[in-house]
Design a protein with these regions (language model features):
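N-terminal export signals
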Residues: 1, 7-31
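N-terminal non-catalytic cap/leader segment that marks the start of a structured domain
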Residues: 5, 10-12, 31-156, 325
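Catalytic-pocket segment enriched in acidic/His residues
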Residues: 40-42, 219-341
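A generic local secondary-structure boundary/capping motif
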Residues: 40-43, 53, 124-126, 146-149, ...
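Short acidic-glycine loop/turn motifs at beta-strand connectors
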Residues: 58, 65-70, 193-195, 265-266, ...
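Structural signature of FAD isoalloxazine-binding scaffolds in flavoprotein oxidoreductases
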Residues: 66, 152-169, 185, 320-331
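Residue-level recognition of short, solvent-exposed, well-ordered loop/turn junctions
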Residues: 129, 136, 184-186, 295, ...
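Short, structured patches in soluble enzyme cores that scaffold and shape functional sites
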Residues: 139, 161-163, 170, 177, ...
Length: 341
């Protein structure tokens, strides 16, 4: 790590800058929402008890729901039962359940088998496709701050990515096209906002959250370290894989009690728990909402635990390269896989 970057981190910190089981919906356990209609509203009634995803079909992003029969094709189910339904996760988050819970029950109990896809055969899309904001939190695990020789932050250190970074489960990160050499992983829990939040309290903050997903804040360290601003090392195309799913908040429970791991070519590199966060999810949402308004669909990468390559002694730093296969695992949320080319 350059002295320039280390000095910046210290100033910012002090001044305030094994496959895991994933729940699915069964015909006995679907919460039917009230339906919010097609008009976008600021605070829709959020869907509950669902594992949702986007998949690609005919150059479109289509909403799927993970069930015990496979991935429900929501659009085809809506057509069969002649009802309206959200078209993708962005629509679901922005406009609420829109009767999706009832539709899933109908499909499970009366739908044709053709409505359900084998999960191994779908082409995933990013779990959120068009957030207004992608917010990231730096140095938010105590042991990670220690391994990089930085003090524990006094306030959350916020930075951002852009939508060009969004990537999917089973996706590809084309590092060979990036003018950099020091590629690094960062396993991260992602918060998906469900309601407009401005100046919310810590006590209420998580009630504004739609759900959670597995994410990866992929980074080019040599670009990141060129200046005190991290952006150019964080915003390359495809540098923010997220997925496979979003679990609604009620299925996750306490987001700060989840095992989090990073694997590279089958070798575990990071192994921690979200309880090591310096600022927990409620604190992050509350703090961020006091800086700017969070909108439904905004996503927050909550920081990475210890074990990143940049935290190793220099003689042990072996940077990622084309051909490497990465897998990010977070308890309950599923395993996010992608390959470097």
């Amino acid at each position: 790590m350059s002295n320039q970057r280390r000095d910046f981190l210290k100033v910012s910190a002090l001044a305030g800058s094994a496959a895991l089981a994933t729940p699915f919906i069964s015909s006995q356990a679907v919460a039917a929402g009230p339906g919010a209609g097609a008009v976008r509203i600021a605070n829709p009634e959020m869907a509950k008890n669902m594992v949702v995803l986007n998949y690609k079909e005919d150059n479109q992003y289509i909403l799927g729901v993970k069930t015990d029969k496979g991935i429900l094709q929501v659009a085809k189910a809506a057509k069969q039962f002649k009802v309206k339904a959200p078209v993708n996760t962005d629509d679901l988050i922005a406009n609420g359940d829109q009767g999706l819970g009832k539709l899933v029950l109908l499909a499970l109990n009366k739908g044709k088998a053709a409505l359900f896809l084998d999960e191994s055969k779908i082409e995933y899309a990013p779990a959120v496709t068009n957030p207004e904001k992608i917010v990231c939190v730096g140095l938010n695990y105590a042991k990670h701050a220690k391994e990089t020789n930085n003090p524990i932050p006094k306030l959350p250190i916020l930075f951002n990515k852009f939508n060009n970074t969004l990537n999917s489960h089973n996706g590809v990160v084309a590092v060979s096209k990036v003018n950099a050499e020091k590629f690094d992983y960062e396993a991260e829990l992602v918060i998906v906002m469900g309601k407009r939040a401005y100046n919310v309290s810590e006590a209420d903050a998580l009630s504004y959250v739609f759900g959670y997903a597995t994410g990866q804040d992929f980074t080019a360290r040599d670009l990141q370290q060129r200046s005190s601003q991290w952006m150019i090392g964080k915003t390359n195309d495809g540098f923010a894989p997220i997925g496979p799913y979003i679990l609604t908040a009620d299925l996750v429970g306490n987001p700060n009690q989840l095992k989090i791991e990073q694997y590279v070519n089958g070798e575990v590199r990071q192994s921690s728990n979200t309880n090591d966060m310096v600022f927990n999810c409620a604190q992050i949402v509350s703090y961020t909402s006091k800086i700017f308004t969070l909108e439904p669909g905004d996503i927050i990468f909550t920081g990475t635990p210890e074990g990143v390559i940049s935290g190793y002694p220099k003689e042990k730093q072996v940077w990622l390269k084309p051909g490497d296969k990465l897998e990010t695992r977070i308890e309950k949320l599923g395993n996010l896989k992608f390959t470097l080319t």
